């Protein structure tokens, strides 16, 4: 009877809801940075090159610190890792708000600090902690809830940001983001790793180094890491540069915000479907289909005439595929190596 339960402990319930809130806030804020470019360009004289470099540095730090926060989460608990990361995230937004934001300071605030914060608050660490609370039969479904409910941040944040930037300016918008991140920091306290009595499967006896050695000797894991490079490239390209791209093609700024919101809205359904299918069929086939369809969506968007209709179709189709890779990918990692070092091993995948 116990094995048929979806939730195996009270901690699992609290952790799932808290992780959803953490991801909603963390990725919701991150999703909107592309909308700030015009304001930063006019007010701070941030060039397209400087902005792009900061986002690139941010992504690099996000990836590099993911395995570190994953190892911290595996050893000391998810809440320790995520709270630590939120401190960096809040600091980055705070210094963007207060300044100075010229030259190297902009790179430190937008790139270094926020990037480190994302390494522990974005999807990989909260999801890996949730995965530790669920058995193989329901793990990908539980993980898909984190992705799907977190997507409300993707959906709501661009709408708020577009309105706030027009009505109140970038300073006020960043101030609100700071408050939201503090709320996320509080929620992070409740993202707890299961105790020994709450574990749904026995931990392996492997050491940290043995787990890493086995992972990189496993062909499937190496291919998974390589494939996720493409996933990260897609997401960063679209989230950062599509807002300016549609404006350059003659569309209005509200269309850019609408694309990001549609991505968030349709990602809810795509993530849930991916999680459900990953529990029923081959995760490899699901991932292959997602990557193929992403390519089709991008080609359609580039080669069709610029219009609101084509932009909305792209937002909806790409949104359906946006983070639908995550439940299948994390499910494969957990299936191959168990959950003891899931934070570390999935963090390495996310690094790519």
PLM segments and residue spans:
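Helix-to-loop junctions at the C-terminal end of transmembrane segments
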Residues: 65-77, 271-282
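Residue-level signature of mid-helix packing/kink "hotspots" within the transmembrane helices
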Residues: 31, 59-67, 154-155, 264-272
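Helix-loop-helix hairpin linking two adjacent transmembrane segments in secondary transporters
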Residues: 145-196
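Extracytoplasmic gate region of multi-pass secondary transporters
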Residues: 33-37, 213-274
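C-terminal ends and interior cores of transmembrane alpha-helices
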Residues: 87-101, 293-306
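C-terminal transmembrane helical hairpin of 12-TM major facilitator-type secondary transporters
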Residues: 263-267, 278-332
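Hydrophobic core of transmembrane alpha-helices in multi-pass small-molecule transporters
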Residues: 104-121, 229, 310-324
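Intracellular juxtamembrane helix-capping segments at the cytosolic ends
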Residues: 40, 120-134, 324-337
